[in-house]
Amino acid sequence: YRLEPEGEEKPGVWFEKRTEGGIDVRRICAPLRVSAVDYDVNGEGFGITAEFHNAVGNLKAVRIGLDELSTAAEKLRGLGLSIDEAPGARQSRVPDYLNAVFQNYKQQGIPLVRRVTRVGWLSDQFTAFAFPDGVMMAPGEDSKERYCMDLPEGAPSFEVKGTLQQWQESIGLTALKSDRLMLSLCVGFAAPMIQLLGLQNSPGVHFYGGSSIGKSTAARGTASIFGSRFGTWRLTDNFAELVASSHNSLPMVLDEISQADRKTMELLYMIANGRGKGRMTTKGGAKKVFTWALTLVSTGEQTTDEAKREKTGKA
């Protein structure tokens, strides 16, 4: 296989095969390069990142697990890669090409990176911490590793705004005059310490009372620390687990507990327990269970007991 990004020949990936009559040369697809080889925090789950320009000229970067290579051609075609082979070809050369590149990634100078699938501490050794924006805090030997973020599809995003000085002058100074805001900030800064302290449950604080007493302001203060999204209690089981896992080692903010329904109230216990529900795959295997260690800040006009009694009829 050879990649021709440009030149006299039509750009693309070409396959050459020696035959009795000479050399059979044919184009497989448009230019397709592997920009990285990755593995997970357990040293398993290897994959590659494939880059190409789609039909409208936009550069696409797609992660493909090595266990997914057999279906790589159809996946890439669906994302806009021009493939010369007919759709559904029984023996597509695209997976073979990608596998050949993987087998020789060191010789080709392709970087090997550690894939991070969630934020927070990466192991029980507490030597590396992944921030939501992809920045890694990894002193010592771990600082020599290269990392890439690969958060689950649908995971809530985080946002970075302003500078540390602006935060200190606005939120920090205001907290000196507000007990609620100060407490909410302490809860937020405590989140990365939960695993370090070996706590089994995820603690939290619920601010309740009438309007205009600073509940939402306090919660927004918590969200400002790591750029968390200001969530609500209107959640399903599945999405709540995804949101909680995406806030591992970080504070999670849920506003207005009155929006919770009867089933949602049970999520309060699930979030505190730090573990989602066990589920089966369509093939009868066990799906990966979401886990987390976080701090929770919640708001509402009612206490959690009052809200639960209203929704479920039980205290």
Language-model segments: residues:
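AAA+/P-loop NTPase substrate/partner-engagement loops
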Residues: H206-Y208, I213-T264
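Short loop/turn elements that form and flank the Walker-type P-loop nucleotide-binding site
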Residues: Q200-N201, S246-N248, F290-A293
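Short helix/loop capping segments that flank catalytic or ligand/cofactor-binding pockets
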Residues: P139-E141, D261-K263, D305-K308
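Conserved RecA-like P-loop NTPase ATPase core
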Residues: F189, D255, V297
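Generic recognition of flexible, low-complexity loop/linker segments
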Residues: S178, M193-L196, N238-V243, I257, ...
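P-loop NTPase catalytic core of nucleic-acid-dependent motor ATPases
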Residues: D142-S228
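Conserved glycine-centered beta->alpha loop in an early N-terminal alpha/beta scaffold
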Residues: Y1-A175, L242, H247-L250
